[in-house]
Regions:
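N-terminal glycine-rich flavin-associated loop
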Residues: 14, 40-71, 95-135
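Short capping/connector residues at structural and topological boundaries
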Residues: 28, 38, 85-86, 90, ...
Length: 135
């Protein structure tokens, strides 16, 4: 796929949607967002956006699709396979702020949570309900 070059209009859209405090661009983006725990693979996104709701994620993804802007999704950056590294630039969609537990269904032994929840927090949460999560 051929991607469009990220520009100031794209940055404005993101900042209007999420606010300037949750959108950083280009050289403002810290090095931690240019790699994951794999090491060796580095790339800088054009924008880093910290989404806080599924509505924001949906609007960002729709805009990116309509404008041919690549999106790399990131949780907490602890991955070991390079999947959270923005190799094509574009938008780094940070979901670490979406860190709520939504539902524990003890009958079916399922847990519904947002993508920013850390595994160590899953363990603590289920222990409070006399359950065990083997990571």
């Amino acid at each position: 796929m051929s991607y469009k070059k990220f520009d100031d209009a794209d940055l404005k859209f993101l900042r209007d949607l999420c606010g300037t405090e949750r959108v950083t661009a280009r050289d403002e983006i810290g090095e931690d967002y240019c790699h994951d725990e794999l090491g060796g693979t580095r790339a800088r996104p054009d924008a880093h956006v910290k989404a806080l709701s599924t509505d924001e994620v949906s609007k960002i993804m729709k805009y990116a699709f309509e404008n041919a802007i690549p999106v790399t999704v990131r949780g907490s950056g602890t991955g070991l396979v390079g999947g959270a590294v923005p190799l094509e630039g574009g938008i780094l969609l940070d979901l670490s702020g979406m860190n709520n537990f939504l539902e524990l269904d003890e009958k079916n032994m399922t847990l519904t949570l947002e993508p920013g929840v850390l595994l160590m927090d899953v363990g603590k949460y289920v222990e409070e309900h006399n359950l065990f999560y083997p990571p």
